[in-house]
Amino acid sequence: NEKLYGLHLAYPVNKKIFAQAAYYHPEAIYDGNTVAYQKNDVYTVGLGYKFDKSTILYAEYLKADKPVLPEQGYSKAGWAARLDYKGAKYNNPGSWGTYVAYYDQPAATIYDHTSEMDVNKMYDTRTNRELVTGYAGIKGYEIGVNYTVARNVMAAFNYFDYQGADNNNIKDRMMWTQL
């Protein structure tokens, strides 16, 4: 039974600048009878700038109550930034958008992420042997493009190139597509 409670606030400072803040509070997440993720509140604050109708830059600072593995020097604070150009609209076939993002987020600030880098076990797929135990966080970039194929049908392609923010022995590249 996984529950996450949160509060997200957004404020348009003016026509170009906007601010956001959020607070997230999870209940402990269990993997069978074992606690897979402890309760750890996360706070975020971000600032965005709209250059024009098509281009937006947004950066966010994230901080957790405590690091996941403090005894190993894992961090509890990080940041992320994203630059968006245009953007596909579900009600506008033929519309498209692209973005680039950079993340430096310790495991303590991530509850779930598309890249699936923040895992507690990683395996060598050739031998199915465990390589690393411990949470990794994410540090690296993501690029993506989306295109509206038909009304309410959007295709997306994302590429991730990450290493662990807390454990840089973990590296991953991944392509992700959606329709």
Residue ranges and their predicted role:
Residues 1-12, 24:
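Contiguous mid-protein beta-loop-alpha structural module that forms a pocket-lining wall or clamp
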Residues 12, 16-18, 23-179:
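Outer-membrane beta-barrel pore domains
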